[in-house]
């Protein structure tokens, strides 16, 4: 067995089912595990802070690293700033109010919120390399997309839809999103080195493209944790705008506004009717075999499922999954039963294993970044267990008083959602 496959097996064993006994480890023990696992995953930066004080800071570079899809979460902050600045009246503003060409058909029903919650219903190819990376104007590509589901009716991760956000921000802010964020967030936070990929039309990408150092990404996380207040005490965003980022989406408990909501624990087991579902949808025998091999397993995360598929299928598992599962309209919930604990953290995550994790109860901000290399080995180098390990670190620490800013419980989420949706101007609540 190769070294990569051996480490993959170790990580998969951890991900399949995390023993509750691990919660009794000391913080020092968990930090040692994270440092060891971070090195095994060839991380370029692992930074963990508590109340802004580093607990672990291991880095091979201080240079900006491409955040991949974690860029989306920072894009959402720009929308929050538009609310604060009064340039966007409501998250439920129809996109057609900004782009009049959408006033016809079902597109007139798409709101800014739907773009942020992945519920727009716009046609989308799961693999960004197929359609998006070669497009000269990503805003126009999104505007021209067909509708494949009723807007607002279902969660479907959508790179194409998020590429419309930079266009919206530019029209409402009067400047490109990179310039807007530099003036309103980056410069006040001391972020001076960053890069943002642009399409041929000169528009910064929405789905990815932003590069930051681990420390600068942690500064974004600390701003979230502190409810919009910078380290020097300056308020950069309203606490309300910050809280909107992690309110549960109407169509998925996993997401807020382009931020992921992380439960303390989750378990996935194969549904008894999974084989029938796979056959009815025409899924290939090869992928059926890989999924049905999980019949007697319990997975502790979606990432563990993906690691299982990688082991079963090899290097081409991702395009196969995108074509056979996502492309046929199937979701994990169609094949696996799930259980999950209370939401205790939120995260910005990106391809290759870019992670920003915030645990409000213990005031932890954690970052893991890795540079893109030809030698990148999935699932080892993706370090998909990093968010779960940060939650485990938080659970190993003594309980603190409830934080002033955090993730609302179910009742709080419902109250906030109801209040937001019943007003034309959320920022004045």
Model-inferred region functions:
Residues 85-122, 144, 173-212:
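Active-site helix/loop module of the DD-peptidase/beta-lactamase fold
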Residues 8-19:
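Bacterial N-terminal signal peptides
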Residues 377-429:
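Short, gly/Ser/Thr-rich active-site loops of penicillin-recognizing serine hydrolases
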Residues 21-25:
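Boundary at the C-terminal end of the N-terminal hydrophobic targeting segment
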Residues 179, 194-326, 332-358, 375-378:
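Penicillin-binding protein/beta-lactamase superfamily catalytic region
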Residues 28, 32-61, 356-359, 363-367:
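A short, well-structured edge-of-sheet supersecondary motif
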